Amino acid sequence: MTEITNKIYYVGVNDRNKHRFEGLWPLPNGVSYNSYIIDDEKVALVDTVEVDFFTQFLENIHEVIGDREIDYLIINHMEPDHSGSIALIKKYYPNIKIVGNKKTLGMLEGFYGVTDDVVEVKNGGTLSLGNHELSFVLIPMVHWPETMVTLDAKNKVLFSGDAFGCFGALNGGIIDAEINCETFWLEMVRYYSNIVGKYGIPVQNALKKLAGVELDYICSTHGPVWHEHIEKVIGMYDKMSKYETEPGLVICYGTMYGNTERMAEIIARAASKAGVKNIVMYNISKTHHSYILRDIFRYKGLIVGAPTYNAGLYHEMEVLLSELANKDIKNHLLGWYGSHCWASKAVAKIQEWNDTKLHYEPVGEPVDMKQAITPEVKAQCEALGKAMAEKLLAE
């Protein structure tokens, strides 16, 4: 068993089998579903795990409390990867009381048909377990409407739900002090940008509610328990939720036969020669868009390019632009280019996306290539890369 601090234990599980989180986001390094036991005069379980892992979950609980009853199940977040074991927990602990806010209890009935033995809490409400006095802070839309966090102020522990989480299974170590966290930082950005990224304002509201709270541990539902890196983790969330970026450039291209890829290489070389050091390039047909969105969240500059396809825009570029619009990612500079064989549509379609959905600041002149690179097209691509570099370096 892993004791985090003063009778607070980790009882979560790892999932190294699932290919995609929520059926969408690749999990090359797996994911953890974190749950916690507070072993006091009254025993509280904070969140559960995905139902497929209930057997291991129950073993973890028994290792901590043996045959004792669980008095309370605190639900910070109702998404099924955290609430999926509720029905089974009730079966094994029939006297358990489920603690949640009004919206939690509505979802509890909707998902699992549970209406009895529930305790509704409001923002600022408290629950005493004996030596542990818990309080509840509602943080709606981080990233579901019922989301709340649970604070043990005496022990300086925050049970944060999905907030401050990241992708990646826990390979032995549970607390960040036991782990080489370098493997988790980019996965935290990918997790935030794809799962929480749409909700920057609610995240800012949550951070303001928690401002001034002294913390020694942040116990999220995914990824490490944060102890040594609390300031960094909160700072990352603050920066990302403000849509603050670094002076770098993401170049995304779709290509069928290499021509738009060659344009991307020319643009990248020009931006580099003009002084931009942080440049990442993606073939959007090869790299899953969750990784691309991660880097778009990090860097201010974005240049996209794709061929015309079936009198429209190359499909994978449509998908990427749709994701950008859906996530409402703000505060970017945008350049674009395209190619066609006989009828130009791609460049106009990208501009339409920006005019109607993205609303990024345009940079440089769009480049529209017919069929293949010419000296004129090469010069236009170089001009686009240079214009973006000058804008980024002037910020």
Which residue ranges define each predicted feature?
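Conserved beta-strand hairpin/beta-sheet module of binuclear metal-dependent hydrolase folds
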Residues: 2-65, 149-152, 156-160, 249, ...
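Metallo-beta-lactamase
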Residues: 3-6, 99-147, 199-205
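FMN-binding flavodoxin-like domain, especially the glycine-rich phosphate-binding loop
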Residues: 170, 174, 180-218, 222-225, ...
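Active-site metal-binding motif and surrounding structural segment of the metallo-beta-lactamase
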Residues: 41, 52-99
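Structural motif
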Residues: 42-44, 72, 156-159, 217, ...
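Terminal amphipathic helices with adjacent charged low-complexity linkers/tails
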Residues: 222-246
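Active-site neighborhood of phospho(di)ester-bond hydrolases with catalytic His/Asp-centered motifs
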Residues: 46-48, 71-78, 98-102, 158-161, ...
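Short acidic active-site motifs
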Residues: 85, 288-292
